[in-house]
């Protein structure tokens, strides 16, 4: 194997040649990784990605994987969200999606996509919790717990949406999302403020079309 060849090549006579071969192999693993990124094959995709990283490190120990990791975690989060939407009882996939976005923010706290998606994800979880049908004879304590759970999701949503709003204050979807969160939190003043901003943006954008 190439790795064995590098180990035996004490004088580094074939170092560059071996590195070129490893680069080709690494790129092959990366291409397989990309082609397997879907809800059916994502586990295999992760394996290919790890193989790609391992070979890349051999060819260049100083290689910076941050951008690869960011893209990888964003793609995995999207897959986990889709798996959850396919089966809403599989709540563990939503936690995996959250963890994946948090992985992105650990590398780049201002990443637009991760902040936006986390904000929307928490908001949607709050809405889903409220919309979940309870038995007619549901205990009051159960109802209160559900309401508290929804409020917790909405509260978690706000910092991410607010951060994205600072980055892109003309994004209609974000402004509307913030207004919706404040509405759900019964904060009428803030809801009206952001709803008016949303309405003004919508009118402004329609006039520009």
What does each model-found stretch correspond to?
Residues 29, 36, 80, 122, ...:
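Residue at a conserved register position within TPR or TPR-like alpha-solenoid repeats
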Residues 1, 13-16, 81-96, 124-160:
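Short coil/linker segments at helix-helix boundaries
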Residues 6-21, 54-69, 87, 103-110, ...:
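Flexible helix-coil transition and linker loops at the boundaries of alpha-helical arrays
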